[in-house]
Structure formats: C-alpha cells, structure tokens
UniProtKB/Swiss-Prot annotation:
Region (Disordered), start-end ranges: 67-94, 212-243
CDD domains listed in its UniProt record: RecA-like_Lon (cd19500)
Alphabetically ordered keywords of this record: ATP-binding, DNA-binding, Hydrolase, Mitochondrion, Nucleotide-binding, Protease, Serine protease, Transit peptide
Name the UniProt record assigns to this protein: Lon protease homolog, mitochondrial
Length: 950
C-alpha cells in the first residue's frame, strides 16, 4: 500500500535529515551544485547529500558508505548519477537502505511508475513518506532504482477507504498528480519504505504496459558503456533525457493486467500571471493567516517559522505560497486535490486562503476548548485545596472529626440500641480496624465501608409488636377478602398458638390455586392482621442464586440477596415475606435458585442463614414466609415438603357476585371518579357479566370488565351524553361488547358415544366432552380385518393417551362380560376425539369418561342427561381418586349438571365443600366401573330387569 505518515515540510525542523536543508531553490542567479560547479539561471538542483557523510545504516547499527559527494570535487560525474552512485546494500542484517546520489531532475520524463496514495496528495517541493507492498510495483521500483531512474508519479485515489497500492483502472484516481523523485528507499523485503520529493504537477495521458524483466540486462550494458565516456554538462543532460528509453514500455492493450503500474504523463504548466495588487493582497493575507495559525497552534510554529525565515522568496513566490498554505491544513482530500489541479494562480491562492481560514477557525476553537478545560481544572484544583485546608483548620479547632472517625462513630451509633450477637460484633470491630488503616481514595476502602453499612443496617434483635387479638385479626381478614376460609382459619390458628406460647415463631405457608383468586392480596391482609411488616419479591423466571443468597464481596457492585434487603427495608426480624410465583422459578448457569430456597424455607436451618455477601449467620426463624403458586407439580419435591400447602380454589358465581358487590364495584367507582348516584350496576347486570363474560375461576377478568363499564359511563357523563348512567341487561353490550360465552355447554342433549367429563387446569375447573365415532363401516362376514383399532385426537398428552388405551382395553373386556354377543369394540375402527384441539390436555382423570363413551357407542344408547363424571380407571375396572374436586364441582354446577360421579376415595374432599356449592347436585361415589355403568345407563338396567322378570 501507499501509506502516508503525513507531510514532511521542506523547511521544518523535523527529525529526518532531508529536512535540514532546502531541497529546491528557485534563484535569480547562479548557484553552486552539489559537486561545487555552477549552474545557469533557472536550473533546478536536488540536494540529497546526507549529514552522515554518505553512509547508510547496515544491520546491527552500522552504516554503509554509498557515495562520497565531497571526494568527487567538481567532476561532471556528480550530476550524472548511475548504478555506482545509487547502490543497494545487499549484505548485513536488518532492512536495506538505498540512498540515491545527487542528480539533476529532468524537465521531461514521460513514462513513470504509478503510486496511488490516500488522503493527502503530494505538493511540489514537499516530501512524503510512502510505503509500497504490492509485489509487482515493488519489483518495478527496484528495477527503476537500479537503472538510475528514481522517479515516480504520485496520484491521489478517489476513494479514501481503498488501501491498495495500485489501482485497477485510471478512473479510480485523480489524473492530476505530482512528479516525485525517490530520495531514499528502505527495502524491508515484503515492502518498500521511500522518502519521495515532489517536483512538479503532471497529468496522465494513458496507461502503459510494463515489459518483462528479461530485457533489462541489455539496457544496463548500454548504460554502463555510456557511463565510461566523459561528456560535458550538455551531454549529461541529453543522457538523462534518454534514460526513460532504457525501460521498455508499450501502450496498454485491452487484455492487459488489471493493475495499473506504468503511465504516460505530461507536465502541467500553470497559466501566466502578473503580480497584481490582488495577488499581493492574497499572498499577504495568506502569510498573515499562517502567522495567526502559528500563534494559536504551536504544532506549526517551529516548522513554518524556519520556512519563512529561510528567505523572503517564499513570501514573494505565489506558486509556492499557495501550495504551502494548502499543505499546512488538514482539509478533505478532494479540497487538497482541487488546489493541486488548479492552474490559475489567482484561483489557487483563493482556494489555499479558504482552506487556511478554515484551519484558523478550527485552531481558534481548539484553543478556546483547551482554555475552558484548563480553567475548569484550575477551579477544581483550587476548590480541592481550599477544602483540604478547611478540613485541617476545622480538625485543629476541634470543629470536625476525620472522615474515618465520623464513619466509625456512625456505624457504632447504629448498633447501640441493637442486640448484636458476639460473632457479628467481632466482625464489625475487625472491619472497623481495617477501615482505619485504609486510604480514603482506595477501592478497598469503599468495599469495606459498604460492607459495614449493610452489616450495621440489619435489625439485630429488633422485632415489631405483633397483634395477638383474634377478634381484631378476624375482622381485618373479613374486611379485605371474601371467602378463603381455609387461609383465614390457618392464620387465626397461628395467632392462637402464639398467644398461648407467649412468643411467635416463623412458619412457611404455600397458597396454591388458579390465577386471580387473591393469593397475593391475602398475604398483605395477613401482614396487616398480624401487625407485621410486609415485603414481597417474585422468583418467577429467576435463574441466579445470588438473587437470594447474595454475591461474594470480591465482585464489583456486589450486594446481599433479597432476604437481607428485606430485613434492611422492614427494620424488623419478624416481617411477613411473600415469595411470589414459586412454581415458575427458573434454572440457569448461575445455579438453581430452588435449591437455595431449601435453606431459606427450612425451619431447622434458617435460624443460621448465611448470605454470601455478609458471610455471617442471620436468624430468620421469626420470619413468616408465604409462597404462592398456580400449580404444585412444577415445585421441586424437597421444596414442597418444607412448606405447608393450602389450596385456594376458584369462586362460583355466587361468590363472584358477592366479591363484585362488596369490593370490585366500589374500588372501580373510586378509580373512575364516580359515585353510586351517577353510575348504577345492579346485581342482575353483574350476574349476566359473570355468566357471559367472566367464567374463569378468579375475579381478575371480572374486575377488568367492571372497570371497562364504569370508564365508558364516565366518558358519557363528561361528554354530556347523559347525567347519570344506568347499566341494564339490555344495554350491557354497549359497554362490554358481544358475549364471549353464549351457550352453557357443547351438547344440551348428549347423543350415543358422547359423555361429559370434568377437568382441572391452572385456570380452574372446566367441563370436557369425550366424543367417539366409527372411522369406517364394520366388516360384514369376511374374516379379513376383524381386529378393530382406536385413533385418538385432540392434542392429548402422553398420560392421557395411555389412559385412553387402558380404557379401550377395559371397555372391550367389560362389554364382552355384559353382552358376549356384542363384538362391536373388537371389530370396529373407532375414532376418539376430545374437542378444543388447540388446547393441550393431559392427565389420567378422564379414564372413566372414555370407557363410558366407548360403551355408549357400542350399545347405541346415550348416557343419562346432565351427567358428568371424573376418575381414573385401572385395567381391571377399579376407579382411582383424582384431584381438583372443588374446581370440578364448581365447573359442573356452572354447566348446569345435576348428577356427578366421583371416586369413592374423594368423598372426604367433597365433604369439605361449602353447602352453596353442593346444593342441587346428586353425587354418586363409586369404587368400580360397574357402579358407573348402572348409573350412566339406567335404561339398560331397566331392560335387563324386565328380561329377568319374564
């Protein structure tokens, strides 16, 4: 690549030796050449003698002598340059440096290697460091140097992001560039690093193709034989003019290589101009702007001052001055290229002045910003010094204590009224001693201070006064919640035990039930009834153990877990802590939080709970933990074993109506800014709302619908449509839309093969129909395809599929026992479907329902109408118990069922139900399927009785 390290100004006091002398002088008379001879007016001389006397560095820090300009005296060979004068070091270690001998730069040199650079073009009379990595271009440049043709054309690429040394098309570069001489070349093996000096502007005429290197020896022999002749200065100039012909090039053809290596160029001459008043004014303004930039930005001061002190000809030469002005700026590449391409000197001066003005404004902005930053730093430093002096003065006068003393006093003041265990006090004393030895600004100081802050914020031995009055606690619970008798009874039992013992102990309760039944809200009421502080945190989706047990102090930003945060916030050792959604706890790479809860919720272990951050035992035995969950299946068994499970079941319509009238409607009126006179909802409307819109187990959706009705009522009142709003069953749809539930159940009259079952989900109980039908007609007479089959659909889980297979096997055996001549289930291909296929279903409690549906299809008789059943059936017909009896009973009553069949072992669960739930239900408890068969098919029993009588 042609990488640039920036401009090296001609007159700058830079480190490179080439900057210690002018490389180009435009004189008005004769000047001495490098060899000591005199040149005529207008001749250009490139002085490339080295300050170390013609020696270049070799490997190991040595220098190799390539030429000795002073030993040649006034001979004419000095200006020729040749292979002997520009040699390449071939021995020694390290990079090889080639320093080229002084030579006269030819006025015309049409064929040049092309070097494409980025960002900053090379201006005439300026130096640039260029690196080349392209192999073909590297070989070409080496060949040119060996032939004493150290000249290149440097052109700017149009795309600054292009990092390549060469281009594939001339369209990728600007066609106006600079004719440059390779002043020094350092061969690094895979790349060349060169110092090039710009001499004049050139323009690309066409692309050339490089001939193979095989033609080179002949050219070199001609060159060597030509060098042996001693010629005059004119002959030397002729020879240099003929040198370009030594490298054979041809015009590029259409099938040439993609890379452009050689081009034919022509010199670009500027337009003639007169030194008018306008030109003088522009040059004076440029010089003034440069001096202003020097005054603002010290980076330009040394180089530009030396440049302008070298001679007044710099100021008097508008051509050089315009190039120098543009080169000093950090303008965009296309702006610098525009200056390079401009041939009108007046316009070039204007463009250079414009770029210098922009640079001047930028320098002023930089100076202003630097001054503001420096002033701010001075003020901050002054304020710091004054504060430190004030601290020392106050300390000497006894008005203020040291920071460390104040911190220690604050921490000890916190612990005065607390009963701190001895092992904790030892840790506090040790940390305070360590804090006194630490520097205030060290990171360890802040870590220790934060640790002591947490350690002294724990309410060691401090407890809130509990309410042990049963009557008051019961009134608080009844005031906030309707129903939930099991929960209220358990809380009152806890108060009674505490009253008899004279002290309280912590307990771990778990409320599980459908969403929206009040599990979370009852916990706050319990805290109010007991007089305890309340703290809630949710573990749903938690995957990090550190959320519960804290982080180690070694981590940045470490802090204790939720339990220690709870103690600090509540300021008591006996708060009520609600751990919400314990059935939805996660597991990740940071450990298993459910395992961390084992120590927290174990009454035998939480008296010495160890947080990772505090690293001292904390007593949690007096904390009342209440957990909530929707289902218990996802709670790990060890964790479930440590908790006292209390079922919070869903509500029936009567309970929902009471909750709505007592709690939901008054709360919604308050939120909407209405009173009872402006918006009226009758019990009939609420019943219709519950029946047609809110059939779920909880009351959360009912609360949303009530708020929706009252919001629309408020809108009508504010908009002036009505003064008061009366919601009736007739206009209810105007407030909440079309009814969601229009029918009570799928089948009002069940046909043969269809039986109603009862299901239990996380949302509560529901009715579930099981349908059976023939997939194909029964085989007639032929013995082929005699064995029947059963296909099951309805998105059933693995357990329910196994239950269906068991029911199918038992139904075939039971039918053969009851009616040996009926082989319907043996030979038929039956399809069993559970409707609502989009809803996943699983569980064994549909076994009795499936057997009844298969027998109903085989017998061609419908089951008893308004009959629902639940229970798991074994392979021998025994009916096994199931769960969710309350939810299933509520769902059956909601669907208008009058007869329910339950397993005999669930009698105790049914007996616990409230009378208003079981009222109007005929319940049968069965132990074997024969009992179900007699209840479900009463007509068949009657027919069999008649047959026996006959």
């Amino acid at each position: 690549m042609a990488a640039s390290t920036g401009y090296v100004r001609l007159w700058a006091a830079a480190r490179c030796w080439v900057l210690r002398r002018p490389l180009l002088a435009v004189t008005g008379g004769r000047v001495p050449s490098a060899s000591g001879s005199w040149l005529r007016r207008g001749c250009r001389v490139c002085d490339t003698s080295t300050p170390w006397g013609g020696r270049v560095p070799m490997g190991g820090g040595q220098w190799r002598g390539l030429w000795d300009a002073g030993s040649r005296g006034g001979s004419d060979e000095t200006s020729e340059g040749g292979v002997e004068d520009g040699a390449t070091a071939s021995s020694g270690e390290g990079p090889v440096v080639t320093a080229l001998a002084p030579m006269t730069v030819p006025d015309v040199f049409p064929h040049l290697p092309l070097i494409a650079i980025s960002r900053n073009p090379v201006f005439p009379r300026f130096i640039k460091i260029v690196e080349v990595k392209n192999k073909k271009l590297v070989e070409l440049l080496r060949r040119k140097v060996r032939l004493a043709q150290p000249y290149v054309g440097v052109f700017l690429k149009r795309d600054d992001n292009n990092e390549s040394d060469v281009v594939e098309s001339l369209d990728e570069i600007y066609h106006t560039g600079t004719f440059a001489q390779i002043h020094e070349m350092q061969d690094l093996g895979d790349k060349l690093r060169m110092i090039v000096t710009g001499h004049r502007r050139i323009h690309i005429s066409r692309q050339l193709e490089v001939e193979p290197e095989g033609l080179e020896p002949e050219a070199e022999n001609k060159q060597k034989s030509r060098r042996k002749l001693k010629r005059g200065k004119k002959e030397v100039g002729d020879e240099l003019g003929a040198k370009p012909q030594l490298e054979m090039v041809t015009e590029a053809t259409s099938d040439t290589s993609k890379e452009v290596l050689m081009v034919e160029v022509e010199n670009v001459a500027h337009e003639d101009f007169q030194v008018t008043e306008e030109v003088k004014a522009l040059t004076a303004e440029i010089v003034k702007t440069i001096r202003d930039i020097i005054a603002l930005n010290p980076l330009y001061r040394e180089s530009v001052l030396q440049m302008m002190q070298a001679g007044q000809r710099v100021v008097d030469n508008p051509i050089y001055l315009s190039d120098m002005g543009a080169a000093l700026t950090g303008a965009e590449s296309h702006e610098l290229q525009d200056v390079l391409e401009e041939t009108n000197i007046l316009k070039r001066l204007y463009k250079a002045l414009s770029l210098l003005k922009k640079e001047f404004e930028l320098s002023k902005l930089q100076q202003r910003l630097g001054r503001e930053v420096e002033e701010k730093i001075k003020q901050t430093h002054r304020k710091y010094l004054l504060q430190e002096q004030l601290k020392i003065i106050k300390k000497e006068l006894g008005l203020e204590k040291d920071d460390k003393d104040a911190i220690e006093e604050k921490f000890r003041e916190r612990l005065k009224e607390l009963v701190v265990p001895k092992h904790v006090m030892d840790v506090v004393d040790e940390e305070l001693s360590k804090l006194a030895l630490l520097d205030n600004h060290s990171s360890e100081f802040n870590v220790t201070r934060n640790y002591l802050d947490w350690l002294t914020s724990i309410p060691w031995g401090r407890q809130s006064d509990e309410n042990l009055d049963l009557a008051r606690a019961q009134s608080v619970l009844e005031e906030d919640h309707y129903g939930m008798e099991d929960v209220k009874k358990r809380v009152l039992e806890f108060i009674a035990v505490s009253q008899l013992r004279g002290s309280t102990q912590g307990k771990i309760l778990c409320f599980h039930g459908p969403p929206g039944v009040g599990k979370t809200s009852i916990a706050r009421s319990i805290a109010r009834a007991l007089g305890r502080e309340y703290f809630r945190f949710s573990v749903g989706g938690m995957t990090d153990v550190a959320e519960i047990k804290g982080h180690r102090r070694t981590y940045v930003g470490a802090m204790p877990g939720k339990i220690i945060q709870c103690l600090k916030k509540t300021k008591t050792e006996n708060p009520l802590v609600l751990i919400d959604e314990v059935d939805k706890i996660g597991r990740g790479y940071q450990g298993d939080p459910s395992s961390a809860l084992l120590e927290l919720l174990d009454p035998e272990q939480n008296a010495n709970f160890l947080d990772h951050y505090l690293d001292v035992p904390v007593d949690l035995s007096k904390v009342l933990f209440i957990c909530t969950a929707n289902v218990t299946d996802t709670i790990p068994e060890p964790l479930r074993d440590r908790m006292e499970m209390i079922n919070v079941s869903g509500y029936v319509a009567q309970e929902k109506l009471a909750i709505a009238e007592r709690y939901l409607v008054p709360q919604a009126r308050t939120l909407c800014g209405l009173d009872e006179s402006k918006a009226q909802l009758s019990a009939t409307v609420l019943t219709l709302l519950i029946k047609q819109y809110c059939r779920e187990s909880g009351v959360r959706n009912l609360q949303k619908q009530v708020e929706k009705v009252l919001r629309k009522a408020a809108y009508k009142i504010v908009s002036g449509e009505a003064q008061t709003v009366h919601v009736t069953p007739e206009n209810l749809q105007d407030f909440v839309g079309k009814p969601v539930f229009t029918v009570e159940r799928m089948y009002d009259v069940t046909p043969p093969g269809v039986v109603m079952g009862l299901a239990w989900t996380a949302m509560g109980g529901s009715t579930l129909f099981v349908e059976t039908s023939l997939r194909r007609p029964q085989p007639s007479g032929s013995k082929e395809d005699k064995d029947g089959s059963l296909e099951v659909t309805g998105q059933l889980g693995d357990v329910m599929k196994e239950s269906a297979r068991i029911a199918y096997t038992f139904a075939r055996a039971f039918l053969m026992e009851q009616d040996p001549e009926n082989d319907f289930l043996v030979t038929s291909h039956i399809h069993l479907h559970v409707p609502e296929g989009a809803t996943p279903k699983d569980g064994p409690s549909a076994g009795c329902t499936i057997v009844t549906a298969l027998l109903s299809l085989a017998l061609g008789q419908p089951v008893l109408q308004n009959l629902a059943m639940t229970g798991e059936v074994s392979l021998t017909g025994k009916v096994l118990p199931v769960g969710g009896i309350k939810e299933k009973t509520i769902a059956a009553k909601r669907a208008g069922v009058t007869c329910i069949i339950l397993p005999a072992e669930n009698r105790k669960d049914f007996s616990d139900l409230a009378p208003f739930i079981t009222e109007g239900l005929e319940v049968h408890f069965v132990e074997h399927y024969r009992d179900i068969f007699r209840i479900a098919f009463p007509l068949r029993e009657h027919q069999e009785a008649l047959a026996v009588e006959r």
